[in-house]
C-alpha cells in the first residue's frame, strides 16, 4: 500500500522550542533596555528610593513589576520594591491569586481592602462608563496608603500606547495638547508618580505576559464596557498601525519633540514680541473689531 501523506494545507508549522526561547530572550532584553532607558531619561529612580508598584493583576502591572525586579538585580543604585494591590471588592475577584504569586517570587506586598465597587456602581447612572470615578477612588486609596508608608515613588503600569491614546483623548474631547507624562508630581504635591513602561508597546507586553504565563486577573468592572472613549481611540490607533506600521511609535516620539513656535499657545511662545519694531502697546481684539461691534444689532 502506498503511504498517504497529509495535504500541504493541513500542515501547521510550529516554531522549534529553541527558537521560541531565543525570541523570548530577545523580547525580554528589549523590554529591559526600553525600561532602563525610560528610567534614565526621566530620572525615575534614585538611590534608596522606596517604590510602591501598583499591581492590578493585569498584563501591564505584572510586566512592570517583573522588569523592575530584573533591573534591580544589576541597577547602579539600590532601591526597594513593594507590590500593592487594591481589592475593590468586585464580585468574583480571586483574592488568592496575587498573594500566592507574590509569595512565590519573594516580593513584599500589601493588599488594600476598600469597597469602591459598591460606591461606583451605586453612584454612576446606568449606561454611563465607570472608569473616571473608579480611577479617582482607586488613585485616592493608593496615594493615601503611599503617604502612610513613606513611599518615595509610585510606579504605574501605563505603557507607550496608553500615553498616545491619552493624548488623542485630550485632543478630541478636551481641545488640548496634553497626555500622560512618564513622570509627574501628584495634584496634592505629595507623591512622585513614575511610568517605567513609557517606551514599551502594548504588543510587546502582551507577548511578554503570555511567555511568562502571569496569572492574569481580568477587570470585570470596566473591562467589559464597550462604549469607552479610550477603546474607541484604541481601535483608531490599531487601524492606523495596521495600515501604516510604526505610526504609534512616531506619534510617541513626537510627544517628546515639541516645537512651541510652530503651535499657537501664547503661554509657550511670545508671538506678540515676534517682529516688533517699537514698544507701542498693540491694539487688542476689541479695537480690531470695533467697527463690526458697532454695527451689531441686539437680538
Swiss-Prot record:
Single GO biological process annotation from the record = tRNA thio-modification
EC number(s): the record gives 2.8.1.-
Signal peptide segment: none
- This protein's UniProt keywords: 4Fe-4S, ATP-binding, Cytoplasm, Iron, Iron-sulfur, Magnesium, Metal-binding, Nucleotide-binding, RNA-binding, Transferase, tRNA processing, tRNA-binding
Q: Which Gene3D superfamilies match?
A: HUPs
The cofactors named for this UniProt entry are: Mg(2+); [4Fe-4S] cluster
Annotated motif PP-loop motif, positions: 56-61
Is Zinc a UniProt keyword of this protein?
A: no
Task: Output the CDD domains linked to this UniProt entry.
Answer: TtcA-like
The annotation note on the cofactor reads:
Binds 1 [4Fe-4S] cluster per subunit. The cluster is chelated by three Cys residues, the fourth Fe has a free coordination site that may bind a sulfur atom transferred from the persulfide of IscS.
List GO terms (cellular component aspect).
cytoplasm
| Catalytic reaction equation(s) | cytidine(32) in tRNA + S-sulfanyl-L-cysteinyl-[cysteine desulfurase] + AH2 + ATP = 2-thiocytidine(32) in tRNA + L-cysteinyl-[cysteine desulfurase] + A + AMP + diphosphate + H(+)
Which residues are listed for [4Fe-4S] cluster binding in this entry? 131, 134, 222
Its domain of life?
Answer: Bacteria
GO molecular function (one): 4 iron, 4 sulfur cluster binding
Q: In which pathway does it act?
A: tRNA modification
- Which InterPro entries does the entry mention? Rossmann-like_a/b/a_fold (IPR014729), TilS/TtcA_N (IPR011063), tRNA_Cyd_32_2_STrfase (IPR012089), tRNA_thiolation_TtcA_Ctu1 (IPR035107)
User: Beyond the main fields, what else does the record say?
Assistant: The thiolation reaction likely consists of two steps: a first activation step by ATP to form an adenylated intermediate of the target base of tRNA, and a second nucleophilic substitution step of the sulfur (S) atom supplied by the hydrosulfide attached to the Fe-S cluster.
* Function of the molecule: Catalyzes the ATP-dependent 2-thiolation of cytidine in position 32 of tRNA, to form 2-thiocytidine (s(2)C32). The sulfur atoms are provided by the cysteine/cysteine desulfurase (IscS) system.
Subunit and partners: Homodimer.
Q: Which family does it belong to?
A: Belongs to the TtcA family.
Q: What is this protein called?
A: tRNA-cytidine(32) 2-sulfurtransferase
Q: Origin organism of this chain?
A: Xylella fastidiosa (strain Temecula1 / ATCC 700964)
Name the lineage: Bacteria, Pseudomonadati, Pseudomonadota, Gammaproteobacteria, Lysobacterales
Gene name of the record? ttcA
Amino acid at each position: 500500500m502506498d503511504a498517504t501523506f497529509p495535504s500541504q494545507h493541513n500542515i501547521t508549522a510550529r516554531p522549534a522550542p529553541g527558537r521560541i526561547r531565543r525570541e523570548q530572550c530577545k523580547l525580554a532584553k528589549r523590554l529591559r533596555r526600553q525600561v532602563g532607558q525610560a528610567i534614565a531619561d526621566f530620572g525615575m529612580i534614585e538611590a534608596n528610593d522606596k517604590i510602591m508598584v501598583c499591581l492590578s493583576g493585569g498584563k501591564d502591572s505584572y510586566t512592570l513589576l517583573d522588569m523592575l525586579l530584573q533591573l534591580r538585580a544589576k541597577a547602579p543604585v539600590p532601591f526597594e520594591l513593594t507590590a500593592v494591590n487594591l481589592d475593590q471588592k468586585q464580585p468574583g475577584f480571586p483574592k488568592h491569586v496575587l498573594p500566592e504569586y507574590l509569595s512565590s517570587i519573594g516580593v513584599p506586598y500589601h493588599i488594600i481592602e476598600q469597597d469602591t465597587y459598591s460606591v461606583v456602581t451605586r453612584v454612576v447612572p446606568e449606561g454611563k462608563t465607570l472608569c473616571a470615578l473608579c480611577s479617582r477612588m482607586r488613585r485616592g486609596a493608593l496615594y493615601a496608603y503611599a503617604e502612610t508608608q513613606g513611599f518615595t515613588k509610585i510606579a504605574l503600569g501605563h505603557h507607550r500606547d496608553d500615553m498616545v491614546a491619552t493624548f488623542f483623548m485630550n485632543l478630541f474631547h478636551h481641545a488640548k495638547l496634553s497626555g500622560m507624562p512618564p513622570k509627574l508630581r501628584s495634584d496634592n504635591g505629595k507623591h512622585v508618580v513614575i511610568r517605567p513602561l513609557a517606551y514599551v508597546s502594548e504588543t510587546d507586553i502582551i507577548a511578554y505576559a503570555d511567555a511568562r504565563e502571569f496569572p492574569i486577573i481580568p477587570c470585570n468592572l470596566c473591562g467589559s464596557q464597550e462604549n469607552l472613549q479610550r477603546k474607541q481611540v484604541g481601535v483608531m490607533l490599531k487601524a492606523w498601525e495596521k495600515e501604516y506600521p510604526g505610526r504609534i511609535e512616531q506619534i510617541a516620539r513626537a510627544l517628546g519633540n515639541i516645537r512651541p513656535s510652530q503651535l499657537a499657545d501664547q503661554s509657550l511662545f511670545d508671538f506678540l514680541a515676534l517682529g516688533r519694531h517699537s514698544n507701542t502697546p498693540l491694539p487688542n481684539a476689541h479695537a480690531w473689531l470695533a467697527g463690526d461691534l458697532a454695527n451689531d444689532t441686539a437680538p
